[in-house]
């Protein structure tokens, strides 16, 4: 049965207004809301119904501090690997581990090798399934008015050891969840000119892999600056982000203009 138009619009609104948040207020998250978010995550699709996700809620301040130290170490290592973009990267805020109301670590469960259905030729489908759970939680958080950020800057083995995970388990995400003063009008990395959203035409092929129409002759995509300029021209016709957050979003594709 088709959803009502208002329900459909709400789904698309959550998708297009979801943001990878890095700025949080210290306000606590209502335990009932957190429970709803985790339940939404647990109802994600998974290949072979393997349900590979495991969530560790971090409530120990010392553990939170230790996790932040791991993230900071990897942030510096990533900067060193970025060459000429090192300084630009270091100016970005890439996590909210210390500020967010709730901190969760998502891991792939141990014993995943026994799940053969759907993984015999694509063993990475356990990761894809867990990513679906994270996306479910992300959209639910946005609908609840909470921000969420996925942090992947950490040494996998170090975080596994810190949280006493069994052999075979693998941490894949540090999730910062909490209240925010405002949601970004556009993805933060787009706002900061780090990158820009590719046109859908560059990602959509028909009956085989084609060179996207927007791809240059040398095989490269437009530079972040060029793509961002185009996105800014589009954004000039958008409604104000604050007004968008309180208005009814249509279901004819226009919600994409908010993103």
Could you say what each language-model-derived stretch is?
Residues 3, 7, 21, 174-229, ...:
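C-terminal helix-cap and adjacent tail motif
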Residues 10-27:
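Generic N-terminal amphipathic, Lys/Arg-enriched alpha-helix
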Residues 78, 169-175:
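Short hydrophobic/aromatic-enriched beta-strand-loop microsegments
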Residues 43-48:
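Glycine-rich phosphate/pyrophosphate-binding beta-alpha loops
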Residues 1-14, 90:
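Extreme N-terminal tail/first-helix region
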Residues 159-171:
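Short, electropositive alpha-helical surface patch
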Residues 50-130:
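Glycine/small-residue-rich phosphate/adenosyl-binding loop
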Residues 37, 41, 104, 112-162:
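Small-aliphatic-rich amphipathic alpha-helix that forms the alpha element of a beta-alpha
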């Amino acid at each position: 049965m088709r959803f009502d138009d208002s329900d459909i619009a709400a789904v698309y609104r959550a998708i297009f207004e979801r943001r990878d948040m890095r700025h949080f207020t210290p306000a606590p998250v209502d335990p009932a809301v957190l429970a709803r978010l985790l339940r939404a995550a647990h109802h994600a699709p998974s290949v072979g119904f393997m349900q590979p996700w495991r969530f560790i809620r971090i409530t120990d301040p010392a553990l939170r501090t230790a996790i932040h130290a791991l993230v900071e170490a990897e942030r510096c290592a990533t900067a060193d690997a970025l060459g000429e973009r090192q300084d630009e990267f270091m100016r970005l805020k890439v996590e909210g581990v210390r500020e967010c109301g709730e901190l969760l670590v998502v891991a792939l469960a141990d014993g995943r090798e026994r799940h053969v259905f759907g993984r015999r030729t694509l063993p990475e489908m356990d990761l894809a399934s867990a990513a679906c759970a994270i996306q479910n939680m992300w959209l639910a958080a946005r609908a609840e008015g909470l921000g969420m950020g996925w942090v992947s800057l950490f040494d996998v083995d170090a975080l596994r050891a810190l949280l006493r995970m069994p052999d075979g388990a693998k941490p894949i995400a540090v999730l910062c969840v909490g209240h925010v003063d405002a949601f970004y009008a556009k993805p933060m990395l787009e706002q900061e000119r780090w990158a820009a959203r590719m046109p859908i035409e560059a990602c959509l092929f028909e009956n085989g892999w084609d060179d996207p129409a927007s791809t240059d002759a040398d095989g490269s995509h437009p530079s972040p600056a060029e793509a961002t300029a185009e996105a800014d021209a589009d954004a000039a016709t958008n409604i104000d982000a604050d007004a968008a957050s309180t208005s009814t979003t249509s279901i004819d594709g226009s919600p994409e203009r908010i993103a």
